């Protein structure tokens, strides 16, 4: 155990609850950990109290089984990453928010399956998106879908104070995932025929900083959620700022919900 005065190496934390989405989050977190040369820490939170020893045993057994399954999936990917596991006790949201103080990023699945895996989107993921002390990735579970040659990362250029950090994270993910970026921004729709010099300048400056990232600017005044609802582009990840965390449900959406056409869009909330 590290001494009080020794610095603690930050990790990529993944919330594990036994769901397919959590496995997806763990696999997604592997490249994040490797790229930063830090461990991948798989965390399965159990209840703070139990009405009986049998209930505790069931809860602990589920957590241990979930961690084994997640670790096996990560190891099967064949990538060299140090794996750590932990089973803390407490409400999942507050426990993971506190753990995020010592994390480079925290990754969670957006849906749960079964008795123990609750619907994370409505509780834990939302709490993390609003309160975590590091970026938060909310991952959709993968399903069989037609192959696509392009799997975009989408981000919006705004005048928000944290937008530059959001753009830098989008560029980092584009390099890591070898994906092109759709950059939304510019004038309102009714003025889209008029060139927006500021938007064009920011895109050009961004490209100069990251010449190896393919950036495709889209002039639109709509937000990411509305843009995705109106277009058919296949998007693997939307990158948003902490102040945009209220969009999370619209971007990720409940599984199979007819209103959310882009229910397979994962989200990275850039919190600092």
Swiss-Prot record:
Which residues of the sequence carry a binding annotation for ATP? 15, 109-115, 123-124
A GO cellular-component term linked to this record: plasma membrane
Pfam name, any one: Usp
Q: Name one GO biological process term.
A: response to stress
The induction text for this entry reads: A member of the dormancy regulon. Induced in response to reduced oxygen tension (hypoxia), low levels of nitric oxide (NO) and carbon monoxide (CO). It is hoped that this regulon will give insight into the latent, or dormant phase of infection.
Gene3D superfamilies in the cross-refs: HUPs (3.40.50.620)
Q: Where is this cross-link: Isoglutamyl lysine isopeptide (Lys-Gln) (interchain with Q-Cter in protein Pup)?
A: 82
The entry lists its GO molecular-function terms as: ATP binding
Q: What InterPro entries does its record include?
A: Rossmann-like_a/b/a_fold (IPR014729), Universal_stress_UspA (IPR006015), UspA (IPR006016)
Q: Which UniProt keywords apply?
A: ATP-binding, Isopeptide bond, Nucleotide-binding, Ubl conjugation
Q: Which domain of life is it from?
A: Bacteria
PANTHER family cross-referenced by the UniProt entry? STRESS RESPONSE PROTEIN NHAX (PTHR46268), UNIVERSAL STRESS PROTEIN UP12 (PTHR46268:SF6)
Q: Which family does it belong to?
A: Belongs to the universal stress protein A family.
**Would you tell me the protein name for this molecule?**
Universal stress protein Rv2624c
